[in-house]
UniProtKB/Swiss-Prot annotation:
PANTHER family linked to this entry: NADH-CYTOCHROME B5 REDUCTASE, NADH-CYTOCHROME B5 REDUCTASE 2
Name of this protein: NADH-cytochrome b5 reductase 2
Subcellular location: Mitochondrion outer membrane
Reactions it catalyzes: 2 Fe(III)-[cytochrome b5] + NADH = 2 Fe(II)-[cytochrome b5] + NAD(+) + H(+)
Domain FAD-binding FR-type residues, every copy: 70-178
Binding-site list for FAD: 181-216
Transmembrane segments: 31-47
E.C. no: 1.6.2.2
Function text: May mediate the reduction of outer membrane cytochrome b5.
InterPro entries the UniProt entry points to: CBR-like (IPR001834), Cbr1-like_FAD-bd_dom (IPR008333), FAD-bd_FR_type (IPR017927), Flavoprot_Pyr_Nucl_cyt_Rdtase (IPR001709), FNR_nucleotide-bd (IPR039261), OxRdtase_FAD/NAD-bd (IPR001433), Riboflavin_synthase-like_b-brl (IPR017938)
GO MF term (any one): cytochrome-b5 reductase activity, acting on NAD(P)H
Length: 324
């Protein structure tokens, strides 16, 4: 469980945050972010994005996941990357190497397995981190999976060997993203709740016509647990007027300059735009305790439930918040 903390912004940082929050979105760089970003063992790695001028229009591809009554599809595990002490990136192959997943941005898939002694199968949703949409990854999908001590699916996935198969079903649609629909979006994530946020961020900055500004607040236990950090740092350097990331850790290292412990009201009040000053949308994804503190729980996948917690206390409306 996260410890509480007090986030004290130095005056220069506070001024920087206010300036960033009030600036109009700058014109997008002519170097959009295209292509899948992948993680490697420990240190991680990623593909650099290429210019759209170097890309020809994508041709029509067959899709693997069509939804409806399609049923479960078994995919073979093709590659495993050990990202850190409790996270792996798993690549699953499609039968047709030229096919695409068919998922929309930030949508998820159901996974299923049944052990030899299990009475019923274990089913869990996961959001892939492979590229989706127009420039979708061909022939595979990638999952970023954190092992939880009492998580039957995460433990099964971590114990899988290359060549074994896993059942998938989907897609499960989430938020229908529209370019520049919002002036500013705020992503509040904990742990592997970063995966749908990453899909949104990559979609926004791969489209030169999308002018959306993005603020990320990301909570983890240790610095090693910050997934996709290199990719987010690259975005901050490339789009300093449109993307900012703030991190908070339960067990920070010495000389850690950012937040310590759980995401608090003080932190969000400091780094998020005021609810009535901009056309904003806030997205939340993380463990149940985080939902309870920040926004309140969803009632069901189709029912967002009422807004409560810190975001309500700060004056945001139910319509301004989406819970993954």
């Amino acid at each position: 469980m996260f410890a509480r903390y007090t986030f004290r912004c130095s005056q220069p940082l506070a001024q920087s945050v206010r300036k960033y929050s009030s600036e109009a979105p700058a014109k997008s760089s002519r170097i959009p972010l295209i292509g899948g970003i992948t993680l490697a063992a420990g240190a991680g790695y990623y593909y650099y994005w290429q210019t759209t001028s170097a890309k020809s229009e994508p041709k029509e591809r067959s899709t693997v996941f069509k939804g409806g009554d399609q049923g479960w599809i078994g995919l073979k595990l093709a590659h495993i990357d050990n990202v850190n002490h409790n996270v792996k990136k798993l690549r699953f192959e499609f039968e047709d190497p030229e096919s695409v997943s068919g998922l929309h941005i930030a949508s998820a898939l159901l996974t299923k397995y049944k052990g030899l002694t299990d009475e019923k199968p274990t089913i869990r949703p996961y959001t892939p981190v492979s590229d989706e949409g127009m420039w979708a990854s061909l022939g595979y999908l990638d999952l970023l999976v954190k092992r939880y001590p009492n998580g039957p699916m995460s433990n099964h996935l971590h114990n899988m060997a290359v060549g074994q198969r896993l059942d998938f079903k989907g897609p499960l649609p989430k938020y229908p993203w529209e370019p520049s629909k919002h002036d500013h979006i705020c992503l509040i994530a904990g742990g592997t709740g970063i995966t749908p946020m990453y899909q949104l961020v990559r979609k926004i900055f791969s489209n030169p016509e999308d002018k959306t500004k993005v603020t990320l607040v990301f909570a983890n236990v240790t610095e090693e647990d910050i997934l996709l950090r290199k990719e987010f740092e690259h975005l901050e350097n490339t789009y300093p007027r449109r993307f900012r990331a703030f991190y908070t850790l339960d067990k920070p290292p010495k000389n850690w300059a950012q937040g310590t412990g759980f995401i608090t009201k003080d932190l969000l009040k400091t780094v998020l735009p005021e609810p009535k000053t901009e056309n904003i949308k806030i997205f939340v994804c993380g463990p149940p305790a985080m939902y309870k503190a920040i926004s309140g729980q969803k009632v069901s996948p189709k029912d967002q439930g009422e807004l409560s917690g810190i975001l309500k206390e700060l004056g945001y409306s139910k319509e301004q918040v989406y819970k993954f």
